[in-house]
């Protein structure tokens, strides 16, 4: 586990959302070369070092934000977004937003605020949450037009010397 860079949340978040009980900050982190996240926003990010990994396999929204959020294999969120006025580039903004939403998904910990408080303050992550709720669960893996496994049936016409196979597609 390696800390990469410290990120301080924009100062105006706390000013516009008084429910936030402290000045938020986090670290961009990697674990075995992959982006990793602190899932409890009000706690300090652990120091760099060796830690046992915990697998979270029963939380659909955590899976989705790790998959579709910053650094995920199907990242589609926060591209082209940067809080430049707050000194954050696109990667830092994507990491920060993914961290906030993962903390909400995992522990509900938003340093005293909730998603509606952030929305009223103009932070606007509620629509992202709702969008991700509608995305496919990445744990389902591939499925096919024939079900969970590809079912291929080939036939051979000896008279015309033609083999035919049914068409199977990914869903």
Model-derived features: positions:
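Short, surface-exposed polybasic-aromatic patches that bind anionic ligands, especially phosphate groups
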Residues: 1-158
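Charged, long alpha-helical assembly modules
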Residues: 164-171
